[in-house]
Swiss-Prot record:
It comes from the Bacteria. Keywords: ATP-binding, Glutamine amidotransferase, GMP biosynthesis, Ligase, Nucleotide-binding, Purine biosynthesis. Residues 197-387 form the GMPS ATP-PPase domain. GO terms for molecular function: ATP binding; GMP synthase activity. Residues 3-196 form the Glutamine amidotransferase type-1 domain. This is GMP synthase [glutamine-hydrolyzing]. Pathway: Purine metabolism; GMP biosynthesis; GMP from XMP (L-Gln route): step 1/1. Its EC number is 6.3.5.2. It catalyses: XMP + L-glutamine + ATP + H2O = GMP + L-glutamate + AMP + diphosphate + 2 H(+). The lineage of its organism: Bacteria, Pseudomonadati, Chlamydiota, Chlamydiia, Chlamydiales. Catalyzes the synthesis of GMP from XMP.
Length: 512
């Protein structure tokens, strides 16, 4: 199978880039920048991409590659830091100069990367720039294929060596299909990668992999959340293992309104019986007095595993399956040490070393949209596939600060009102994710001519294709007013409702 490998130097957009390539029906995998050359060559990649990153190539301890990689006859595309690295390795100078951020006028010249964009002489457009360093002059044998006012060397090519560089990010600069065209030219025309990454093929490969990984007499325990990921995984595992799968739904006390009963009914309709384990008191006890969001996530994660470990002893299982997907892995610990951890995900962070079960994560290299597509192939009802994502820690990360039962009940009620109104207005499927957040701050209001001192609820709705980046959803004033009025009137403890208008980045989708 053809594949493109991305060496990750720490860009926050590396995995957006991987998803863009997979959308071309070509498999793409992200590896740490310091992956040994021998391991890279064993993968037999059709092409390599050096990602962007936060470092400067002229820094003493900046990430570097084995220069023998340039003699492997593998097409290489450097993006931002990746281009600067190629330029430096071939003798050019990189220095800090005038910064360029945001949409910038740029000129493209004829080149293999720009086929279909530049017919004869030049193509003028705007592209999103985000860099502090620049290549001063192209290395020997390279020629310039793009320039901007403050970055004369905005793209370079050395066709004979199949080396290419872009100072901008094609994966996030696509306002007119430009980035998609550039990536398609590299992947399909320069690397000549075949289109073998198709969801029907993925289903068969995953089932085969599960059968190979799990012994013939071994059993698997799956924790259900009712969300897209665990629902798809449940059906996938059932198809692969049959009755050797045991599904357990843990009631953490941090779930949405009526979640337990809804999940039971959903899976019974699919022919899957589930065991419900009420561990809510345990979770509230362990979280008592804890305010730090990272600590809360890790406590929820470790408690979750302990509950599963206890249940597993009565079921004689050897494997614990989790619906971890690529974005969970990315946000918990980027695939290289050049970036910082944004937040731990309960599926992959805080796992105790004494875990008594082997870990099975069949979906960990699939993006959310790929999981949804897999669900359709598996025949899941639309109600499963179109459901908004729900964080593993549940409402534990939607109650800011200390988690108390009364706070959870308030946000649970507010969230159900918000979702109900979205569905009534036919907006639920038009936003990617929507929820309410409890803020442990009180403000003054007037209810029934009396002074009222109540809590604040924040509403958040975002639009995103991959959840690596997201834009806040511009819901109408009339709609938000309706939601606010219902929440304040129906929940006595609440006196104020606000709407979150923060994009990701800089904000994350969840507040904690």
């Amino acid at each position: 199978m053809s594949k493109i490998l991305i060496l990750d130097f720490g860009s926050q957009y590396t995995n957006v880039l991987a998803k863009k390539i997979r959308l071309l029906s070509v498999f793409c995998e992200v590896l740490p920048w310091n992956t040994p050359l021998e391991d890279i060559l064993q993968e037999s990649p059709s092409g390599l991409i050096f990602s962007g990153g936060p470092h400067s190539v002229y820094q003493e301890n900046s990430p570097k590659v084995d220069r023998e990689i340039y003699n492997a006859n593998i097409p290489i595309l450097g993006v931002c830091y990746g281009m600067q690295l190629i330029a430096r390795d071939f003798g050019s100078e990189v220095r800090g100069g005038e910064n360029e951020f945001g949409y910038t006028p740029i000129v493209f010249y004829p080149g293999k990367l720009f086929q279909g964009l530049v017919d004869k002489d030049a193509f003028h457009t705007e592209i999103r720039m985000s860099h502090c360093d620049s290549v001063t002059v192209p290395p020997k044998d390279f020629f310039i294929t793009a320039s901007s006012q403050h970055c004369p060397v905005a793209a370079i090519e050395y066709p004979e060596k199949k080396l290419f560089g872009l100072q901008f990010h094609p994966e996030v600069s696509d306002s007119q299909g430009i980035g998609d065209t550039i990536l398609s030219n590299f992947v399909k025309h320069i690397c000549r990668a075949s289109e073998t990454w198709k969801i029907e093929t993925i289903e068969k490969q995953l089932i085969q992999r599960i059968k190979e990984q799990v012994g013939e007499k071994e059993r698997v325990l799956l924790g259900l959340s009712g969300g897209v990921d665990s629902s798809v995984l449940a059906v996938l595992l059932h198809n692969a293992l049959g009755d050797r799968l045991s599904c357990v739904f843990v009631d953490t006390g941090l779930l949405r309104k009526n979640e337990v009963e809804e999940v039971k009914q959903q899976f019974l309709s699919l022919g899957l019986e589930i065991i419900v384990e009420d561990a809510s008191e345990t979770f509230f006890y362990e979280l008592s007095g804890i305010q730090d969001p990272e600590q809360k996530r890790k406590i929820i994660g470790s408690t979750f595993i302990e509950v599963f470990d206890k249940v597993s002893k009565n079921l004689e299982v050897q494997w614990l399956a989790q619906g971890t997907i690529y974005s969970d892995v990315i946000e918990s610990a980027k695939s290289c040490d050049a970036t910082q951890v944004i937040k731990s995900h309960h599926n992959v962070g805080g796992l105790p070393e004494k875990l008594n079960l082997k870990l099975l994560e069949p979906l960990r290299f699939l993006f959310k949209d790929e999981v949804r597509a897999l669900g359709k192939v598996l025949g899941l009802p639309e109600v499963f596939i179109s459901r908004h994502p729900f964080p593993g820690p549940g409402l534990g990360v939607r109650v800011l600060g200390e988690i108390r039962k009364e706070y959870v009940e308030i946000v649970k009620h507010a969230d159900s009102i918000f979702i109900e109104e979205l569905k009534k207005a036919n907006l639920y499927d038009k936003v990617s994710q929507a929820f309410a957040v409890f803020l442990p701050v009180k403000s003054v209001a007037v209810k029934g001519d009396c002074r009222h001192y109540g809590y604040t609820i924040a509403l958040r709705a975002v639009e995103s294709s991959d959840f690596m980046t997201a834009c806040w959803s511009p819901l109408s004033r009339e709609f938000l007013n309706r939601c606010s009025s219902r929440i304040i009137n129906e929940i006595p403890e609440v006196s104020r409702v606000v709407y979150d208008i923060s994009d990701k980045p800089p904000a994350t989708i969840e507040w904690e």
